């Protein structure tokens, strides 16, 4: 298998964590007899400095000519005075729009070894493994009309979806549920919102195509509570843009650190992958960044763009093994290093690479 990946490391800790993820990807590819062609381009603040724009034309062209785009992080305090459409984050929004992905995949899982990092009790989070599928191009964030009328003191936004928009993201969610534990929870507010009534009716319609998947519906307010007191009850969670934004961020407490979470945006011309954490400029270049979210993002690339399930699972198992062995980055040690070996960004990347290699060689 040959996979062409554009790496846009971006700003802050982006280059550090992305570098460690790429070394793991290379190791896995070599061991499996696969070829990964890597191409590096600028995006975000580094592109503003060197190219005068957050998304250079050659970066976008390279993205559209790739099998996957691997983004590190964008942003920095020195760019906050720029107009919004000139800031690093604008480059991310532009590349997302150009690639056309409409389904955002965000895993939320609990590592037994990190239960102490979660504000929830260990017996609640242990064993939780949720995949959020969030519709990314419709809903309140994109609906029109939208306006803030400062003269009248009024503002309004429009939550709008078409049946086709709901169908396409729902099919992806069901297909993913078929590969997992065959349960799908659709989240809406159908007791109040007409757009949610369309959403629920459409999900039920598509469900007929997937009789092997169990379907349930939850109101978003109830779901926000259930996520915190019974997260193990959920497998694939499907929802619209606003609700998905809020719920997937809330679910980060299950894992206990944003540095552990990967994400993927699929369904468009080219899939876009990025760890959930930001650019964290305050720790950039100090070896303090947690690369595990980026490494797990690499696993998503292999799974969703390469079709390499065994290799993706090996990376995920390698991360778990390293945590079981007591290795931590500073954010995971949380000032209490008793019994842990605290590693730098590069050391953690090397430890995961070594562990994954050992597992694949001995498989």
Regions found by a protein language model. Name each.
Residues 11-14, 67, 133, 173, ...:
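Buried hydrophobic positions in well-ordered alpha/beta secondary-structure cores of metabolic enzymes
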Residues 45-48, 228-327:
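Glycine-rich phosphate/nucleotide-binding loop
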Residues 49-156, 242-244:
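N-terminal glycine-rich phosphate/adenylate-binding segment common to multiple enzyme folds
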Residues 1-5:
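Extreme N-terminal starter segment of soluble prokaryotic enzymes
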Residues 31-57, 225-227:
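N-terminal beta-loop-helix "entrance" segment that forms/cooperates
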Residues 6-23, 27-29, 150-221, 233:
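Glycine-rich phosphate/diphosphate-binding loop of Rossmann-like nucleotide-binding domains
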Residues 137-138, 142-180, 184, 190-192, ...:
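Glycine-rich phosphate/pyrophosphate-binding loop and the adjoining helix
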Residues 191, 199-200, 204, 208-262, ...:
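Accessory "access/gating" subregions that flank catalytic or transport cores
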């Amino acid at each position: 298998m040959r996979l062409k990946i554009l790496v846009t490391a971006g700003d802050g800790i982006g280059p550090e964590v992305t570098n460690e993820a790429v070394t793991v990807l290379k190791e896995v590819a070599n061991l499996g007899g696969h070829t990964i062609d890597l191409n590096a381009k600028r995006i975000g603040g580094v592109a503003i400095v060197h190219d005068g724009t957050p998304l250079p034309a050659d970066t976008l062209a390279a993205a559209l000519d790739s099998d996957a785009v691997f983004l590190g992080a964008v942003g920095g305090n020195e760019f906050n005075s720029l107009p919004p459409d000139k800031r690093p984050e604008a480059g991310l929004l532009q590349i997302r729009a150009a690639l056309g992905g409409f389904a955002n995949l965000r895993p939320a899982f609990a590592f037994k070894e990190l239960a102490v990092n979660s504000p929830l009790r260990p017996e609640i989070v242990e064993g939780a493994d949720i995949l959020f599928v969030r519709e990314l191009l419709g809903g309140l964030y994109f609906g029109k009309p939208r306006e803030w009328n400062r003269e009248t003191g009024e503002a309004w936004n429009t939550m709008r979806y078409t049946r086709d928009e709901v169908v396409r993201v729902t099919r992806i969610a069901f297909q993913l549920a078929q590969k997992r534990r065959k349960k799908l929870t659709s989240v809406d507010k159908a007791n109040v919102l007409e757009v949610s009534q369309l959403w629920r009716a459409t999900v039920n319609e598509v469900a007929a195509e997937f009789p092997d998947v169990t379907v349930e519906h939850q109101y978003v307010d109830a779901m926000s509570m259930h996520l915190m007191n019974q997260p193990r009850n959920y497998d694939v969670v499907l929802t619209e843009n606003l609700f998905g934004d809020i719920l997937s961020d809330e679910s980060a407490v299950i894992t206990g650190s944003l540095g552990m979470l990967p994400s993927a945006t699929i369904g468009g011309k080219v899939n876009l992958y990025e760890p959930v954490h930001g650019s964290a400029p305050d720790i950039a270049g100090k070896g303090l960044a947690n690369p595990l979210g980026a490494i797990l993002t690499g696993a998503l690339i292999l799974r969703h763009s390469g079709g390499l399930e065994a290799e993706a699972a090996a990376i995920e198992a390698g991360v778990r093994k390293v945590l079981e062995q007591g290795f931590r980055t500073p954010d995971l040690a949380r000032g209490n290093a008793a019994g842990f070996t605290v590693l730098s960004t590069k050391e953690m990347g090397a430890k995961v690479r070594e562990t994954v290699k050992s597992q694949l060689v001995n498989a």
